[in-house]
Amino acid sequence: MAKQIIFGEKVRVSLKKGVDTLANTVRVTLGPKGHPVALERKWGAPTVIDDGVTIARDIELPDAFENMGAQLVKEAATRTSDAAGDGTTTSIVLAQALINEAFKNIAAGAEPINLKRGIEKAVAALKAQLRKNSTPVKGKQQIVQVATITGKDPEIGNLIADVMDKVGKDGVITIEESRGLRYETSYVEGMQFDRGYISAYFVTDPGRMESIMEDATILMTDRKIETVAELLPALEKILQISKNLVIVAENVEAEALATLVVNKLRGNLNILAVKAPGYGDRQKAMLEDMAILTGGHVISKEAGRKLDSVTEADLGHARRVVSNKDKTTIIDGEGSAEAIKNRIKQIKAQIEETESAFDREKLQERQAALVGGVAVIAVGAATETEMKERKARVEDALAATRAAIEEGILPGGGTGLLNALPCLDALKLEGDEATGVSIVRKALIEPVRWIATNAGKDGNVIVDKVKNSPVGHGYNAEKDVFGDMAEMGIIDPTMVVRSALENASSIANMVLITDSLVADIQDKNPAPPMPEAPGMY
């Protein structure tokens, strides 16, 4: 296909337009008085939401070059969401400020590479200072505060704190939709392991990049499945029992994987393929744990069994299976309580007998997976639109709470970034590198400015007051007062603030040194779509 190419100043103009279009849409959601954005859906009511990364993911611009700018800033939000679960709007606001300030200086004759070096040195110093300023989470009340701020609801804050109190900071917590009107919590048998779906084609929720399987039938094997010949007889048997199939295998490859994907896309069956956790003997043991939890049996090479020997009794069952690219959670397996209890006793005995610290750790992980179970938070509401918005807030609150426990907390409301600014005074740089540091200084005020602006205040006035306040003091936009942010319960997880700054600067540096863009020339009369292929397999 023929390409269109632009250079120099045209590149900066196009990228800036794309960055500004996306950032201006998202930044209105920042802070406790931020405004939601309505996203059109192809069917049904629009989704009204104030989650920055969800809004950003929905934006595609018609101009190919402007869209590149938007997609790069979207990447900053997505990386922050993946790392910390929150801070996505902050990362977009910071990226926009860094890019716009850098472009002004480039237009005035600054060298992009030297600006980039200055920005990198400033961000490295700020990250170190943020870690120094961070304080560990102390007690349940601070967990309530973190979850309340991110979830924008005290009920969500108390809910997350109560659940984490019961399952522990490393416990498995899942969030699902409910037919009720409020929040409900339950604790069920379940396990989570560090393997995700084999192919993204199995995703059922593109927004969260997750595959969710209700009333799942589970086939477990330590075999590698490569050909249709070995898969098809088993598949035909299972389809007579259930159309919701989860395959947990050493691997599914080549022809077999292609067959599953094609049938999934055609709607012939609802399927998810996941790699089995662990390796060697540990993999066999974990598959056996899974089989006991779900009431099935492992189709094992050691037992001389092939896939075509599968029977209904071999299949495990669970109320729900959720898988992303990294993890899979089995919820409410239908295994016998007595069998699970006996398996836990067996693992305990192995822990006592082993002399290897590594083996003991892995056995304890298996024991925790069977003993701990899974906490389920069911989110309900009067309408589907409200329910999805609530669910997104609960997910963000949970992710932010885990981040706070891991790296500690800072004063919230953008104050943590402003408190770290003095560390830049120690950087003795010259020329364009010093200008790069100044660009970062200007960008760091933007989160506070936009929190205040969205609350109907003059953002610049609020920023000046916060800068001249004691360390840890900032602006409470919810109550329109200044004071000690920690005492007012306004705190941010250090990981969220650090990730937002790190990812915003990374994307900004990429944008400011880019000097040419290449895109396809769009056909004004595109070809009609291919007709759907008939038949199964």
Curated annotation (Swiss-Prot):
Output the Gene3D superfamilies linked to this UniProt entry.
Answer: GroEL (3.50.7.10), GroEL-like equatorial domain (1.10.560.10), TCP-1-like chaperonin intermediate domain (3.30.260.10)
MF GO annotations: ATP binding; ATP-dependent protein folding chaperone; isomerase activity; unfolded protein binding
Which keywords, in A-to-Z order, does the entry hold?
Answer: ATP-binding, Chaperone, Cytoplasm, Isomerase, Nucleotide-binding
Write out the annotated subcellular location. Answer: Cytoplasm
- Annotated positions binding ATP: T29, L30, G31, P32, D86, G87, T88, T89, T90, G413, D492
What is the enzyme's main class? isomerase
For this protein, what is the EC number?
A: 5.6.1.7
Domain of life according to the entry: Bacteria
Name a biological process GO annotation.
protein refolding
Q: Catalysed reaction per UniProt?
A: ATP + H2O + a folded polypeptide = ADP + phosphate + an unfolded polypeptide
Q: Name one Pfam family in it.
A: Cpn60_TCP1
Q: Name one GO cellular component term.
A: cytoplasm
What InterPro entries has UniProt attached to this entry?
Chaperonin_Cpn60_CS, Cpn60/GroEL, Cpn60/GroEL/TCP-1, GroEL-like_apical_dom_sf, GROEL-like_equatorial_sf, TCP-1-like_intermed_sf
Assembly and partners?
Forms a cylinder of 14 subunits composed of two heptameric rings stacked back-to-back. Interacts with the co-chaperonin GroES.
HAMAP family to which the protein is assigned, alphabetical: CH60
Function, as annotated: Together with its co-chaperonin GroES, plays an essential role in assisting protein folding. The GroEL-GroES system forms a nano-cage that allows encapsulation of the non-native substrate proteins and provides a physical environment optimized to promote and accelerate protein folding.
What family is this? Belongs to the chaperonin (HSP60) family.
Q: What is the name of this protein?
A: Chaperonin GroEL
Taxonomic source organism: Dehalococcoides mccartyi (strain ATCC BAA-2266 / KCTC 15142 / 195) (Dehalococcoides ethenogenes (strain 195))
* Name of the gene this protein is made from: groEL
